[in-house]
Amino acid sequence: RSTLVELLEGAPGEQVQQPVRSAVDDVKRQFGLGDHHLRLAKAGRKLYVEVDFVVPEDYVVRDEDTVRHNLLARLEQLPHDVWLSVEFTADPTWGD
């Protein structure tokens, strides 16, 4: 069953999702980010993590890179090959 879910790019199990959600929430608090939308998919050892953060309009690219590096450092501790994509937007409709 879990192999079929992975092939269909379904959400991974709770034991995979929980540490990712915790890492995203920690980074969100640390950097004062707004709402976010998190998408996860798992295929074998590869874990695809996509996060969209809502940020203030004056947010700068240098800050975005710092957030990405910090989040990746946390996720690399997981027993998966993490493929991370982090997006930033000032439009709150993208954070839903």
Regions found by a protein language model. Give the residues of each.
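Alpha-helical transmembrane segments and adjacent TM-loop junctions that form the membrane-embedded core
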Residues: 1-96
